[in-house]
Structure formats: structure tokens, C-alpha cells
Amino acid sequence: MVQFNLPSNSKIKKGQYYKDKTGSKNIRKVNVYRWDPSKNENPRIDTYEVDMDNCSSKVLDILNKIKNEIDPSIAYRRSCAHGVCGSCAMNMNGKNGLACTKSHSELDGDIDIYPLPHLKVLKDLIGDLSTLYKQYESVEPWLKTTKINDKENIQTKEAVSYTHLTLPTMMS
């Protein structure tokens, strides 16, 4: 199993159990790592019974369903929901991946969701990305102009068409 960066002197304990209230026969248990540093408590694993008949196919859909219908206090990152930005990266059943691209049907048994193991946990499934942002800034991944203009910089048709040629490669 993966080693997680837990708060010092902590032990993960059993948390709350949220029983399904829909009466559905198609239920999956989803175990989610929860920790709130403001509460001065140990991390816990909360278990949610989720009605899979009314849930879309991805793990991110399960988390959204939990947040919208069962427990609005759960904290996790999400953004594009198309596997591009990486915001929803987390550990699912022992493997790191994107919750927006991972189909819950690919995961056997109960679904265990943890934050990424190599990041300091800020809250629940949210890892500290400050080191990533510093590295990102150090490579300066933005366009730079050679001249300072007081007016808007208008792109030429050639520059726009070049951008459209490279975008599919970047998104692949």
C-alpha cells in the first residue's frame, strides 16, 4: 500500500458512515480520506454508500454526487473534467490518477480515495501544490514579447493558424 504524508503523531481512524437513503439496489461503498487541520483531530476515513444507478461513470462524478447530495463538507480539487488540467489527481484504490478520466467500473470492490501520497495534505483530498507552482513559474511557460506596446497586441492570421496546428498535439 502507498505511504501517505500524514500529520505528525496521527493515525487514520474510522470516520462517519453515510448510509444510502434512496433504496437503490445498486450501491457502492466509497471510502474517502478526510482531514481538516483546523479541527486538531486525527485523519479519518468516511464511508459513503452511493446509488450507482444515478451516478455518471467517472470517479469525479461520484465525488461530485457525494458533495452535492450527501456531504457538502468534502474538499477536493476539480476543474476541466476532461483529463487536461490535472486538478483532480488523487489516489484511487492504491493507484494515482485523474478522477475525471478514471471510470469507477475499472475499480473492483469498495472504492478507496486518498490524496496523492507524495504531497502534504492541506485538507481532505487537497494536496499542497506550492512546489509545483514554483517549478512551473521557473520555466516561464508563457509567451514573451520583444517589444512593449501601449496598445493591444493583435495576432496575425498566420500566428493564429500556427496555434491551431499545435493545439491538438498539446491536448493529445
Question: PLM features: what roles do these ranges have?
Answer:
Residues 75-105, 165:
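Local cysteine-cluster metal-coordination motifs and their immediate loop/turn environment
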